[in-house]
From Swiss-Prot:
Annotated segments matching region Disordered: 117-137
Known partners and oligomeric status: Interacts with the iron-sulfur protein subunit within the SDH catalytic dimer.
Gene Ontology biological process terms in this record: carbon utilization; gluconeogenesis; mitochondrial respiratory chain complex II assembly; regulation of gluconeogenesis; succinate metabolic process
Domain of life per record: Eukaryota
Classification via InterPro entries: SDHAF3/Sdh7
The family this protein is said to belong to: Belongs to the complex I LYR family. SDHAF3 subfamily.
Residue stretch of the organelle transit peptide: 1-15
Keywords associated with the record: Chaperone, Gluconeogenesis, Mitochondrion, Transit peptide
Pfam families in the record: Complex1_LYR_2
Name the UniProt record assigns to this protein: Succinate dehydrogenase assembly factor 3, mitochondrial
Function statement: Plays an essential role in the assembly of succinate dehydrogenase (SDH), an enzyme complex (also referred to as respiratory complex II) that is a component of both the tricarboxylic acid (TCA) cycle and the mitochondrial electron transport chain, and which couples the oxidation of succinate to fumarate with the reduction of ubiquinone (coenzyme Q) to ubiquinol. Promotes maturation of the iron-sulfur protein subunit of the SDH catalytic dimer, protecting it from the deleterious effects of oxidants. May act together with SDHAF1.
């Protein structure tokens, strides 16, 4: 893992060139960001909190050993944007720009589509597990 000072330098250079986040935001260290996200999840409904906690924990664990500074910066910047969405209450209104969608692989787009469909089922009250139980009676 690279040092914090080197990481911040790379992040500032990358952010200024690509407009990742505004000038008033600074990059949070990974552990602090992780803890703030988990605290912010307490504001979510129980189902979203549970799903969010599991996802955040697995993603941070998977990215623990990354050494590429640009990957680290992109990862932390994306999660910091997510944190701002949750703390501002805009998590339900989030949408992807066409530019972000174009950068995704076909596999990622497929996963996103499946997630969208499952989310729609939950918000509409359709629960396939409940339906299976009803058919057995």
């Amino acid at each position: 893992m690279i040092g914090r000072r080197q990481l911040v330098t790379v992040f500032r250079r990358y952010a200024s060139q690509n407009g990742v986040i505004g000038q008033d935001h600074t990059l949070l260290p990974p552990l602090m960001l992780y803890r703030r996200i988990l605290r912010a999840h307490k504001l979510l409904p129980p189902m979203q909190k549970e799903m969010g906690d599991k996802y955040v924990k697995s993603e941070f664990e998977l990215h623990r050993t990354i050494d590429n500074p640009l990957h680290i910066v992109g990862f932390l910047a994306s999660w910091q944007d997510y944190l701002h969405q949750i703390t501002n209450g805009k998590w339900k209104e989030g949408s992807l720009s066409p530019a972000v969608l174009e950068k995704m692989s076909p596999e990622q787009v497929g996963q996103l589509y499946e997630l969208m469909k499952e989310t729609e089922k939950v918000t509409k009250g359709d629960n396939p597990e409940e339906d299976k139980g009803k058919n057995k009676i």
